[in-house]
């Protein structure tokens, strides 16, 4: 029997089919024939109604049928449904050539179609289905005549291989019911509550949710508050629904007791795939549903992650919740949703509306976008701005501090490696000394707050770190500064000390002692807070009731560009008279889970809005992190060429590191890889096996050269690639496994604000007909390129990436310097790829309209999409070039045919199958990919689809 086409073979039949379908959509006739006389078949596609048994598959999770045709989406209908619904098992039609087969792994039985692939037999007319990992990793060890290197996924280019389930013909698709990507999105949302919902329900206007858009200028405080409250409410509902959908049932646990603590170990395979993300301190609920003990439930807190398995996590059970230690099965796990941050944002908005004294009038006017003259604040001339415990400042840092000291509202822009934290600490020191009042220092993340608190402690200021009650059990580098630790550090023979000892000994207190304990502890905490000069906490925790008794005339918000505007408002309404926002609007912005809310403008930070209103940020201009050659492109592209180097080339070169840099004095290169991207096991992300293999080889070379594992970082935009790279290094790396475990593989988001000696970036995206997704986000690229100190290697497919204007200029930069290479790592040679003229920018929309479009296109989005929109910044040659780049993503649908317009709207609203980010997301979510300028097939990047003439496979192993 003829075998299916192998990966790498060109498939002209598929190309012709796609061409015909494209031509069909460009033709506005787009015929659709609906025969009301014929009843709809039970196995008809739930989207388009196509009912050819050879072209449909059944989703076994919901018992709905879907076809393998694209229609007006960038994925086939069955793949689109699996991604949106997070379903992971399919079945062929009983009348299809393969019968009612459920594809599953021959070795482990996994039925996840995003994980499955096939190996062709050498002598038999059969194929073996194996999951990508771990089963295919071990396939070569079986003496069965199978070659694991020939493994290919069942889904490529977002459609099932045509030898498994046929792709409908052009004629069939013409007769199918037309359905847009937006209709599919709404239909999937309706199915969550009503599995019988139809397209007729989708067309009901009641299901359309209209959200107000944020403005730059507000007429009144009431208008400002109402708009933001509606957006917060929509985001809150979306976030809550995400958490509720994560409930895990019938899980197995293991118990561990030591040092008076009870830990429960839970195995969650979804941790590895990225479908579930947990962080230290996250709250969950564990429920026992079996019959071996009374019904039991308890809140639990994530305490640590396994160093051996990426799927196991240990959670701590609170004292007093006696766990059923003899039970290991029949448990449910719920993800506790807390709306604390949302309620605090709403309270801050209400306070802004009701109390004009909650902040200085000039700050209030600036927030409303009113045109005001910002008055100067009288300051005593300081002979020296030096601060004990901190390094001397450079000219741009000194200039920024001098300007900020005399202004009621200021912005400081800190590009990568420019000493933003040191500058902030110096500024805080002088503000506290000059104003002789306490100061509130905030950031959206605990990591940023800890870093700033540590620097401030060195200056001799009385610093107190306030954390939420749920994080008090977690250790950090500044735990000794925390309020809860200092409050507990009392004389043992004091009344509070006695109660603390009694509580620890007995695991709790009686009601009378508990009341005394709380009163004494609150008094102790008040004394500490009142004595502090600087209180450091997150933006959300600045509304902690323990701070209600205090006013904070001085407020500094670090990483302000990563916080939403209502989040920044929480500390500002605590009586702010002088406000400093520190951040970088050319790096990552706020995380917004609901893409509709993002499009409405909530993903634009307060810092960015003030820049657009004309508030000029004070920019730090000397970078101390990167080798000068590494900083050249980011400086020219993102900072108007203004970044200066505070380190020399000699200080950032290591001659003993055996990486074959194309130019030894320039430790950087773009390593051309042509491997195809694949959808990850979660169905919502991407991976690239060829690039993962290159990552392992490069990491191994660095380790062998003596580079410490902790000084190597691997950055990838995709959670699927992150997990695959980690596993690939463990299975295939030639060094000891512990060395690879210490290598940090993470997202761009996780690396923001951090650095490593050597950074490897794996781009992942490599396809025939799709775009590069949120790789086109300029801020994401900026962060990825600016994490390395001594060396940077970017791995990707230049033929695909160069279709994007931003990446085109990046690749030309490397090509012109002979830094774009290909071949084996031991024999690198300059790449022969030739670039044509840059992609032609198209006419831009208005700034506000562009912002909304970028919110949709600049980030990947499927169903649960954390959105970071690209920034439209200040004027200048470099900025104008960047705006031109973004213009390619903002076609005006009115100038297109209806079919093209539908396609474009689908691109903006639906990006079909991708995403994530990681550590740092404040909510569980995965994301699904994006599609921009179409990439034409290259000879080296061809489809793995079987030809339509290939006989159907009749046997699986």
Model-derived segments and spans:
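Cys/His-rich zinc-coordinating "finger" modules and their low-complexity flanking regions
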Residues: 1-175
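Pre-ATPase regulatory/linker segments immediately N-terminal to the P-loop/RecA-like helicase/translocase core
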Residues: 6-7, 136-215, 220-227, 250-252, ...
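Short, charged beta-turn/beta-strand-edge "cap" motif at the junction between a beta-strand
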Residues: 51, 71-74, 289-294, 542-543, ...
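Intrinsically disordered, low-complexity regions enriched in proline, serine, glycine
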Residues: 56-58, 68-71, 75-81, 114-118, ...
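Hydrophobic beta-strand signal
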Residues: 66-67, 285, 760
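ASCE P-loop NTPase helicase motor core
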Residues: 300, 321-324, 368-485, 515-521, ...
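Conserved helicase motor core of SF1/SF2 NTP-dependent helicases
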Residues: 434-437, 445, 540-941, 946, ...
């Amino acid at each position: 029997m003829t075998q299916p086409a192998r990966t790498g073979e060109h498939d002209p039949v598929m190309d012709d089919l796609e061409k015909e379908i494209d031509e069909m959509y460009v033709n506005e006739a787009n015929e659709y024939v609906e025969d009301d006389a014929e009843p709809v078949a039970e196995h008809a596609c739930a989207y388009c109604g196509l009912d050819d048994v050879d072209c449909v598959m059944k989703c076994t999770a919901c018992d709905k049928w879907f076809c393998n045709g694209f229609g007006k989406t960038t994925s086939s209908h069955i793949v689109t449904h699996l991604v949106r619904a997070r379903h992971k098992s399919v079945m062929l039609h009983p009348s299809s050539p393969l019968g009612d087969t459920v594809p599953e792994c021959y070795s482990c039985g996994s039925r996840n179609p995003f994980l499955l692939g096939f190996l062709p037999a050498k002598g038999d007319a059969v194929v073996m289905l194996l999951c990508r990992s771990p089963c295919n990793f071990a396939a070569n060890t079986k003496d069965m005549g199978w070659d694991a290197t020939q493994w290919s996924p069942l889904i490529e280019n977002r459609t099932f291989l045509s030898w498994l389930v046929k792709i409908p013909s052009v004629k069939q698709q013409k007769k199918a019911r037309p359905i847009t990507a937006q209709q599919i999105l709404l239909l999937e949302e309706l199915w969550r509550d009503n599995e019988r919902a139809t397209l007729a329900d989708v067309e009901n206007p009641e299901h359309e949710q209209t959200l107000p858009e944020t403005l730059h200028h507000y007429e009144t405080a009431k208008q400002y508050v109402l708009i933001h409250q509606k957006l917060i409410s929509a985001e809150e509902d979306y976030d809550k629904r995400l958490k509720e959908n994560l409930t895990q049932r019938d899980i197995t646990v293991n118990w561990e007791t030591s040092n008076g603590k009870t830990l429960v170990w839970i195995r969650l395979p979804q941790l590895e795939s990225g479908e579930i993300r947990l962080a230290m301190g996250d709250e969950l609920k564990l429920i026992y549903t079996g019959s071996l003990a009374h019904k039991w439930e308890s809140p639990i807190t994530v305490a640590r992650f396994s160093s051996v398995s990426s799927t196991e996590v240990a959670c701590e059970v609170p004292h007093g919740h006696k766990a059923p230690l003899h039970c290991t099965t029949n448990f449910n796990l719920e993800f506790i949703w807390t709306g604390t941050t949302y309620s605090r944002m709403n309270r801050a908005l209400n306070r802004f509306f009701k109390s004009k004294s909650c902040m200085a009038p000039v700050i209030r006017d600036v927030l409303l976008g009113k045109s005001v003259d910002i008055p100067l604040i009288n300051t005593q001339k300081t002979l020296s701005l030096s601060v004990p415990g901190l390094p001397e400042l450079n000219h741009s840092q000194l200039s920024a501090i001098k300007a900020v000291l005399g202004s009621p509202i200021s912005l400081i822009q800190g590009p990568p490696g420019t000493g933003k934290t040191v500058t902030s600490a110096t500024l805080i020191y002088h503000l506290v000394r000059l104003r002789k009042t306490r100061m509130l220092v905030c950031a959206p993340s605990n990591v940023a707050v800890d870093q700033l608190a540590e620097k401030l402690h060195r200056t001799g200021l009385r610093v107190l770190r306030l954390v939420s009650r749920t994080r008090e059990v977690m250790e950090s580098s500044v735990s000794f500064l925390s309020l809860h630790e200092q409050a507990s550090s009392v004389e043992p023979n004091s009344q509070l000390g006695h109660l603390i000892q009694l509580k620890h000994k007995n695991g709790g207190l009686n009601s009378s002692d508990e009341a005394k304990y709380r009163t004494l502890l609150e008094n102790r905490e008040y004394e500490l807070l009142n004595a502090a000069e600087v209180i450091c906490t997150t933006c959300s925790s600045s509304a902690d009731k323990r701070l209600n008794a205090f006013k904070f005339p001085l407020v500094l918000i670090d990483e302000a560009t990563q916080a939403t505007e209502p989040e920044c408002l929480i500390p500002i309404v605590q009586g702010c008279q002088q406000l400093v926002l520190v951040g970088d609007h050319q790096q990552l912005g706020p995380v917004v889970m609901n893409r509709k809310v993002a499009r409405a403008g909530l993903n634009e930070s307060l810092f960015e809005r003030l820049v657009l209103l004309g508030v000029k940020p004070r920019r730090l201009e000397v970078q101390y992190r990167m080798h000068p050659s590494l900083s050249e492109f980011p400086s020219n592209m993102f900072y108007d060429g203004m970044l200066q180097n505070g380190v020399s080339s000699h200080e950032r070169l290591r001659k003993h590191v055996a990486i074959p840099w194309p130019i030894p004095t320039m430790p950087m290169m773009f390593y051309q890889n042509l491997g195809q991207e694949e959808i990850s096991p979660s169905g919502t992300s991407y991976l690239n096996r060829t690039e993962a293999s290159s990552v392992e080889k490069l990491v191994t070379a660095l380790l062998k050269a003596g580079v410490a594992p902790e000084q190597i970082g691997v950055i990838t935009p995709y959670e699927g690639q992150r997990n695959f790279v980690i596993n690939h290094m463990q299975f295939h790396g030639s060094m000891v496994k512990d060395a690879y475990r210490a290598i940090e593989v993470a997202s761009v988001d996780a690396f923001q604000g951090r650095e490593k000696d050597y950074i490897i970036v794996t781009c992942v995206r490599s396809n025939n007909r799709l775009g590069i997704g949120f790789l086109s986000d300029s801020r994401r690229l900026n962060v990825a390129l600016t994490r390395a100190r001594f060396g940077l290697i970017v791995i990707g497919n230049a033929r695909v990436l160069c279709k994007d204007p931003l990446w085109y200029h990046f690749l030309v930069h490397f090509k012109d310097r002979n830094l774009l290479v290909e071949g084996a790592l031991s024999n690198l040679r300059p790449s022969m790829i030739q670039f044509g003229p840059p992609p032609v920018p198209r006419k831009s929309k208005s700034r506000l309209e562009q912002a909304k479009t970028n919110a949709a296109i600049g980030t990947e989005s499927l169903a649960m999409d954390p959105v970071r929109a690209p920034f439209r910044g200040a004027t200048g040659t470099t900025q104008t070039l960047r705006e031109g780049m973004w213009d390619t993503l903002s076609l005006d649908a009115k100038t297109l045919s209806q079919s093209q317009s539908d396609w474009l709207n689908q691109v903006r609203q639906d990006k079909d199958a991708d995403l994530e980010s990681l550590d740092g997301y404040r909510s569980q979510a995965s994301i699904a990919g994006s599609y921009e300028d179409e990439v034409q097939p290259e000879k080296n990047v061809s489809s793995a689809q079987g030809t339509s003439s290939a006989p159907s496979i009749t046997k699986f192993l």
